[in-house]
Amino acid sequence: MSRDIERNFFPDNKNNFRHIREDEIIASYLKHKNTRKAKLVVYTCITNDYDDLSNMPTHYYAHKDADYVCFTDNETHIKSGQVGIWQIRPLEYTRGDSTRNNRWHKTHPHVLFPEYEESIYIDSNINILSDYLFKVIKQTGSPLVLPKHPKNICIYSEYKDVTSAKLDSLELIIQERKILEDSGMPENYGFCENNVLFRKHHDANIKNMMDEWWNMITNYSKRDQLSLVYILWKNGILPQNITFENTRFLINDFYVFGHQKGR
């Protein structure tokens, strides 16, 4: 039976609506999947039922030449092995809290996917509506591509926001900020939102940066946005050269839902 419900409607440029049947997308994708071997994997990670994959069994634009993988600790999904276009895999890392377990998967595509050349991590509350992301990745030509932050252009502004909202341990935030300041991290260097991450994950520099990033997340704030731009700066990478417009502003290309749970 076709999934014909309200979330299948999104505005287009003419303020009309488009209707896409999820079951048709899934069937078409799975049929083509059996005819090829993918070099690209699109993946997400859901811990502690932070989001419900049953609500998004496919992106409305499912790239026919990419595999889709979801890591989760949801036993029902693990037993099923497949939800829509998503191949279900159990978590590979469970030694941290639910947030850091997610972050490990986010930062370790080189460990998780040795058989793929490229990967796109995407938060589980984002639905890809068009081929825009795949085009911008090709046009950018960088081994790392991600969105701009919707508000901040300075990492220190993000530290203030996270502190004010009490989103993590104040002690860890202060310790991490001091590392940046002592290292000479400049203000207004540029800033990213890490809800979509394309990587050529076997690139040596990318692997080293991901290891550095994970080290910061492990030892300091679990808020990964507080450390990635610092890693980019240390490696001489300008955010403006590897970013595209924030997903929330690209309403014809992405739909960003609220998370099922706060983290």
Task: Give residue ranges: language-model regions.
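N-terminal anchoring/stem segment of glycosyltransferases
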Residues: 1-102, 112-116, 219-222, 234-237, ...
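Extracellular structured ligand-interaction cores
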Residues: 39, 65, 121, 193-196
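A residue-level signal for conserved active-site and pocket-lining positions in enzyme catalytic cores
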Residues: 42, 68, 110, 125, ...
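Short His-Asn-centered micro-motif
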Residues: 43-46, 71-73, 122-124, 130-131, ...
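Short, solvent-exposed loop/turn segments at secondary-structure junctions
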Residues: 47-50, 75-77, 93-96, 126-128, ...
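Core catalytic alpha/beta fold that binds nucleotide/phospho-ligands
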Residues: 53, 69-103, 130-141, 157-187, ...
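GT-A fold catalytic core of metal-dependent nucleotide-sugar glycosyltransferases
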Residues: 108-164
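Catalytic core and acceptor-binding pocket of nucleotide-sugar-dependent glycosyltransferases
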Residues: 167-263
